Structures are given as C-alpha cells and as structure tokens.
Amino acid sequence: MTEVEEPEQPTTINEEYDLWVSNVPMMYDFVSETRLTWPSLTVQWLPTEMQPREVDGQQLLRQELLIGTLTTDNEPNYLKIAAIDLPENVTSSKPSVSDDAKENELSHRQSKIKIVRKFKHEQEVTRARYMPQSPNIIATLNGAGIVYIFDRNIKEKDHGAIASFSYHKENGYGLAFNPTVSGQLLSASDDGTVALWDVTSTANKSPSQTFDVHTDIVNDCKWHEFQSSLFGTVSEDNTLIIHDTNSDRAIQKLSVSSAFNTLAFSKRSENLLAAAGTDSNVYLYDLRRLQKPLHSMAGHEDSVTSLEFSPHQDGLLTSSGSDRRIIMWDLFNIGAEQQPDDAYDGVPELFMMHGGHRSPVNEFSHNSNVPWLMCSVEEENVLQIWKPANKIVRPPQPPADFDITTLE
C-alpha cells in the first residue's frame, strides 16, 4: 500500500520565536526583552544626552523612552519613563564583533529597562508623544479621547498632568506634535474628529481648530515634515485626507478600497508620503499626484499598525503589523534585480524583518540619537529594544539616477 504523506504542520508562534532567538547573534548587535506588568499601547524614544558613564569598569550610555499602561478597571494607569543603560559599542558605529564573540557576550547585553519616573494617568494611555521643541513636555491621549499634558521638569513624586483638553467624545489613537511649530498638537478620535491644540496656552481649554471631514473613526494623524501648516489623516471611512490649518476644508482627498491605519511623511523628500492599513500592503504616494500610488510593498501578512521614516537613513521606512512583524524597507532597492533564491525571501526593497514578537505589534520607535536602535511594544506586555548588526546595515545609497517619482 502506498504511504500517504502527512501534511506539514504549520510552525507555531513559540517555534517561530525559538528560531528567531537562535538567529539573534547573527542578526543583531543588541537585543533586550522586558515583560511589563501591563501592556503598553504606545512607545517613543526620548531625546537623551549622549554622555557615557562608567559602571563597574564599563562605559554605559543611558537612553530613555515613553511607555504607558493598559490596566484592568481596578488598577491605576500611568505614563512611564523607562531607561536602559547600553554598552558603548552598541551606541557607536564600530564594526560588529564576531558571531562567536557575540554568542559569549549576549547574556551581558540583555539589559533590562528600569522605570525611572511615572505619572498618574486617567484611564489607559493610548498614545504618548514629547514636544520636539521642548522634550520635557509630554502629551498623552486616553480611552475617553482626553488630551493630557505633563511636564518632566516638575520633580514632585506622584505629580500628575499640568493640563487637560477635552473635545473628543470617544477613544483615540492619533496624536502628533508639529515638528516645526512649537506647541501645536493634533489629536484624532474614534468619533471622526480631529482637533488642533495650542499646549503653550493651558488656560484655553478649547481647540484652536477642529476638522470634521471624516465620516468614521480617524485612525491616525501626522504633520508634514517641511510645510508647517500641512497634515494628513487616515480613517475607517476609507479615505486619506491632506489638511491645511489655513483652511477648514480638505485640500486633497484620496479614496481607497480598504482603510488605512497609519501614515508617515518623509523626513527627506517633501512630496513623499507612505500609508498602510488593513490590506497589509505599504503604499508610497507623491503629494503632487495623490490619486495613484507610486508603488506598493508586500511583506506583512496582516494589518499594518504603524509607519515611521528613519530620522537617520534616507530612503529607510519601517512598518509594524498585527502579524507580529516589523519590516524595514529600503526604498532605493525598489525595482532592483533579484536572483530566484533571493525572491523567495521577499521583494528587493524588504531590507530586514524583525520577528521577535509573539503577539501583534502596537507601536515602535526609531532612536533619534543612535542610528538603527529601535524599541517596540506588543499586545502581550512585552517591550523589546534592538539594534540590527552593523555588518548587515549599511546606509541605503540611491543610484545616481534614482527618482522616487518614476516608480509608477
């Protein structure tokens, strides 16, 4: 009798994680994993002085980041500032040590984070962002759509928010400080509204402007990196809208077949915009011709949850997803020729895939001080800090004749 081959069983999440752990010495210069008491829906590196200090004969550099809590009804919530002490060789651009040496040193690199400050917070922290012009000022958004402002300069223990702003009627996940105008803060809500606040005037509790152009949940809002009055929003009403604070009307509107969850404006090219959402693809757009994407990138297997352009490397875009993956995309490799074996691993612009999470990724952040240093949080209480190995990360360099607008 002919033997019937049993179908190959799919790899379990824990088996995938074990495989990732086995590859850490080859793929990373640093990995730290911390199980938090409560999940954090948000994470962002804080700008920190690059001044190493000696601890037990080792030069360490402290970096700090923002996280929040999502607790049960009976437990208090907090905005937290976490810190991690990194070895000097992790924060420099020196060549990676050999794989054998890294395997021996890896246990010493598993630095755990420490909570160095926490602020009482009403309800869960859905988003937390620092003000670029004054990083001690931190804004949060909670489960009721209320915006809170905190000041790190106030040192009293158990100090709470210095101001709160109420306009939204529901939960929200969109929160963004204007990178070019101090004190301007956008918030977006599940009630379909977007509000603009002046956080330098805490006596005024009303928004400076409101934008009611969406007909469903607003998933995200982001400022343009160069033009101070422009920002974008994406919504469950299947639209991406470009707004101008000088007008109450949308200046551009794109309708799509499936909703975008997130968007990001390029920090280097003023016309480049990325957006992604429920169909798992990442789309690139030219603001001058918004109605048709320049290019779409496939790599995620579930909804994309967040997007961010690198503050250091031109052409590097990062995305996270409900598929437990974080992908770094090298836009300069779009259209590059591939060998058949390489094509099996993904499209040519898929630069690196971080597979260390075991549940959907809520958010991630690029460190503004240390190139390639990342932090990310997942649904199951885990915070990871990681840096790809120097031997595999090379600043993406565009060909001399490369033009992002020719990708149509």
Swiss-Prot record:
<feature type="repeat" description="WD 3">
    <location>
        <begin position="213"/>
        <end position="253"/>
    </location>
</feature>
<dbReference type="InterPro" id="IPR019775">
    <property type="entry name" value="WD40_repeat_CS"/>
</dbReference>
<dbReference type="InterPro" id="IPR036322">
    <property type="entry name" value="WD40_repeat_dom_sf"/>
</dbReference>
<dbReference type="InterPro" id="IPR015943">
    <property type="entry name" value="WD40/YVTN_repeat-like_dom_sf"/>
</dbReference>
<feature type="region of interest" description="Interaction with the histone H4 N-terminus">
    <location>
        <begin position="341"/>
        <end position="345"/>
    </location>
</feature>
<comment type="similarity">
    <text>Belongs to the WD repeat RBAP46/RBAP48/MSI1 family.</text>
</comment>
<feature type="repeat" description="WD 5">
    <location>
        <begin position="299"/>
        <end position="339"/>
    </location>
</feature>
<feature type="repeat" description="WD 1">
    <location>
        <begin position="120"/>
        <end position="160"/>
    </location>
</feature>
<dbReference type="InterPro" id="IPR001680">
    <property type="entry name" value="WD40_rpt"/>
</dbReference>
<dbReference type="InterPro" id="IPR022052">
    <property type="entry name" value="Histone-bd_RBBP4-like_N"/>
</dbReference>
<keyword id="KW-0539">Nucleus</keyword>
<keyword id="KW-0156">Chromatin regulator</keyword>
<feature type="repeat" description="WD 6">
    <location>
        <begin position="356"/>
        <end position="396"/>
    </location>
</feature>
<dbReference type="GO" id="GO:0005634">
    <property type="term" value="C:nucleus"/>
</dbReference>
<comment type="function">
    <text>Regulatory subunit of the histone acetylase B (HAT-B) complex. The complex acetylates 'Lys-12' of histone H4 which is required for telomeric silencing.</text>
</comment>
<keyword id="KW-0853">WD repeat</keyword>
<keyword id="KW-0677">Repeat</keyword>
<dbReference type="InterPro" id="IPR020472">
    <property type="entry name" value="G-protein_beta_WD-40_rep"/>
</dbReference>
<dbReference type="GO" id="GO:0006325">
    <property type="term" value="P:chromatin organization"/>
</dbReference>
<feature type="site" description="Important for interaction with HAT1">
    <location>
        <position position="272"/>
    </location>
</feature>
<dbReference type="Pfam" id="PF00400">
    <property type="entry name" value="WD40"/>
</dbReference>
<keyword id="KW-0963">Cytoplasm</keyword>
<dbReference type="GO" id="GO:0005737">
    <property type="term" value="C:cytoplasm"/>
</dbReference>
<comment type="subunit">
    <text>Component of the HAT-B complex composed of at least HAT1 and HAT2. The HAT-B complex binds to histone H4 tail.</text>
</comment>
<dbReference type="Pfam" id="PF12265">
    <property type="entry name" value="CAF1C_H4-bd"/>
</dbReference>
<feature type="repeat" description="WD 4">
    <location>
        <begin position="255"/>
        <end position="295"/>
    </location>
</feature>
<protein>
    <recommendedName>
        <fullName>Histone acetyltransferase type B subunit 2</fullName>
    </recommendedName>
</protein>
<feature type="repeat" description="WD 2">
    <location>
        <begin position="167"/>
        <end position="207"/>
    </location>
</feature>
<dbReference type="InterPro" id="IPR050459">
    <property type="entry name" value="WD_repeat_RBAP46/RBAP48/MSI1"/>
</dbReference>
